[in-house]
Curated annotation (Swiss-Prot):
Gene: uxuA
Keyword Manganese: yes
Similarity annotation: Belongs to the mannonate dehydratase family.
Lineage: Bacteria, Pseudomonadati, Pseudomonadota, Betaproteobacteria, Burkholderiales
GO molecular function: ferrous iron binding; manganese ion binding; mannonate dehydratase activity
Coiled coil: none
EC number(s) from the headed UniProt entry: 4.2.1.8
Species: Burkholderia lata (strain ATCC 17760 / DSM 23089 / LMG 22485 / NCIMB 9086 / R18194 / 383)
Protein name as it appears in the record: Mannonate dehydratase
């Protein structure tokens, strides 16, 4: 079980994370290097040393961002891809085994509220389709999850560049990228794990190509090797009513292509609105127990984190990344796994 940590500026300390039963690994990254630059080996080594001094392990990076010029397929992408490959080598040399990344144009995860109040008084991240439909990014209006490093005119120019990039072009650019980096990842002993689009649908006319079962199947076929794998995020994919997360885990888990599991719950409305809930199955639209069983049945040996959490018990900090609810989620997931391991006598694929 792993836990995301945003470095020394994170209000959640490594000391507190270490106290969560069953949490052994930290998921982190180098946050002060510009996108597209090589992550220096000495910074990676220093991060690893900090984590290990706290009695935890560092084997998963989330994320190494992909420069927009690579997604756009611009002429300068080869230099940026070379930088990405060198970062993979540095991470592999430091003992990192999985790198999570995404291929979402312009915007990373998108939410319309960071602190929606739930019936129990806790607050959560939420997404409203109507709110997004009323927004024109060209007007300079921002939403949570957007890259704040873009000035309004820069964002407008970037969006203009994507007007000529449809799904087919984005697929071609992802294929070019994967064929360039996966052989290096294999040599470095690293598995790449692409994260689904969040939410799993086009927004603002931008193409999205990591949103459902067919997209995931196409991605793993582009370079058909275990080093080209998935971060299967139940919350991101589960926000799309068409996605059967349990079935996705069974299919791609049986293939050995899920290297990183983000397990969290969401409550999804018929119109596509959703809010992030407690991990417990009854709190949201996903059967978390069935999802965890699917991982168990397919012999999953990768990395897991509870992903996001609500803000509870008066905690403040980075929305979605407080200590308390994520800790509850980690313990809940570990409890499900322990029960399956001890009492489910159905052989897993790993023992058949």
């Amino acid at each position: 079980m792993s836990f995301r940590w945003y470095g020394e500026s994170d209000p959640v300390s490594l000391q507190y994370i270490r106290q969560i039963p069953g949490v052994t690994h930290i998921v982190s990254a180098i946050y002060d290097e510009p996108v597209g630059e090589v992550w220096p080996a000495h910074k990676i080594d220093a991060l690893k040393a900090t984590i290990e001094r706290a009695g935890l392990q560092f084997e998963v990076v989330e994320s190494v961002p992909v420069h927009e010029d690579i997604k756009l397929g611009k002429p300068g992408r080869d230099r940026l891809i070379d930088h990405y490959r060198q970062t993979i080598r540095h991470l592999g040399a430091a003992g990192v085994r999985v790198i999570c990344y995404n291929f979402m144009p312009v915007f990373d995860w998108t939410r319309t509220e960071l602190s929606k109040t739930l019936d129990d008084g806790s607050t959560c991240l939420a997404f409203s389709t109507d709110a997004v439909d009323r927004i024109d990014p060209d007007d300079g209006i921002a939403l949570p999850g957007w890259d704040s490093s873009y000035q309004p005119e820069q964002l407008k120019a970037l969006l203009a560049e994507y007007r000529d990039v449809d799904e087919a072009a984005l697929w071609a650019n992802l294929e070019y990228f994967l064929k360039a980096i996966i052989p290096v990842a294999e040599e470095a002993g690293v598995k790449m794990a692409i994260h689904p689009d969040d939410p799993p649908r086009p927004i603002f006319g931008l193409p999205r190509i990591v949103k459902n079962r067919d997209d995931l199947a196409r991605i793993v076929r582009i370079v058909d090797t275990p080093a080209n794998g998935l971060t299967l995020c139940s919350g991101s994919l589960g926000a799309g009513p068409q996605n059967d997360v349990e079935a996705l885990v069974r299919e791609f888990g049986a293939m050995g292509r899920i290297h990183f599991a983000h397990i969290r719950n969401v409550k999804v409305d018929a119109n596509g609105d959703f809010e992030e809930t407690a991990h417990l199955s009854s709190c949201g639209s996903l059967d978390i127990a069935a999802i965890v069983k699917a991982y168990h049945d397919t012999g999953f040996t990768g990395y897991v984190r509870p992903d996001h959490g609500r803000m509870i018990w008066g905690e403040t900090g980075k929305p979605g990344y407080g200590l308390y609810d994520r800790a509850l989620g980690a313990v809940y997931l570990n409890g499900l796994w322990e029960a399956l391991a001890k009492f489910d006598r159905t052989p897993s694929l790993a023992t058949q």
